[in-house]
């Protein structure tokens, strides 16, 4: 699954940058990293790439994720999925949750690497177990579809719930849908309506539609 740029940016800033101040950087590399962030805010991705490259080469996982994102989306550098995978892998192997999510997506889609659902699930799971909501959603979806794992509606619901409780709108919709259909959980229209409402409030249009139908007694 290719995530919108805004989603990977959110994942990076929400998880990778959480460790920013604890990283053992001297003043100059830290300033260099910050200058890269400021460059992206101006739309100057080439400058950001040049600033982050030496940090990534020195083994900084956050910079590695950002380089992977740059290569994946052609931001300041020629688009190259193989290079994106290389940098995501380096960060993922250091335990970066955003990188694990992205590496899983590259395996699921077969971009820059041979398509492999089992390998995708491996990386989604590592990110999900660190509490990354988008990875928890993805794990729920692969259990729902039986991609790389044995199809299991109960496991799908378990992961939807974890992501939903962290505020992921699509997971909230999927959890509501599971309650509506009784997939992996007992039918409960009241709870379905509750989760559809939360999804709607978080911008998931399908949640609004289903909430309205339940409210009008059409389902």
Language model: regions and residue ranges:
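Bacterial N-terminal signal peptides that target proteins for export
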Residues: 1-11
């Amino acid at each position: 699954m290719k995530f919108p740029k805004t989603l990977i940016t959110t994942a990076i800033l929400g998880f990778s940058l959480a460790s920013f101040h604890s990283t053992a950087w001297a003043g100059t590399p830290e300033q260099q990293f910050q200058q890269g962030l400021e460059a992206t805010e101006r739309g100057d991705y080439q400058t950001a790439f040049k600033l982050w490259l030496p940090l990534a080469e020195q083994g900084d996982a956050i910079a590695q994720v950002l380089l992977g994102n740059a290569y994946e989306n052609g931001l300041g550098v020629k688009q190259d999925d193989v290079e994106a995978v290389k940098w995501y892998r380096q960060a993922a192997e250091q335990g970066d949750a955003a990188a694990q999510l992205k590496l899983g997506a590259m395996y699921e889609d077969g971009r820059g690497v041979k398509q492999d659902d089992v390998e995708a699930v491996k990386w989604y799971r590592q990110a999900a177990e660190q509490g990354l909501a988008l990875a928890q959603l993805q794990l729920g979806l692969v259990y729902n579809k039986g991609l790389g794992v044995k199809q299991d509606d109960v496991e799908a619901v378990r992961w939807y719930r974890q992501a939903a409780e962290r505020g992921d709108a699509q997971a909230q919709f999927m959890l509501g849908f599971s309650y509506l259909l009784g997939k992996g959980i007992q039918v409960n229209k009241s709870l379905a309506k509750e989760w559809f409402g939360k999804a709607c409030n978080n911008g998931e249009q399908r949640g609004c539609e289903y909430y309205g139908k339940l409210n009008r007694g059409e389902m």
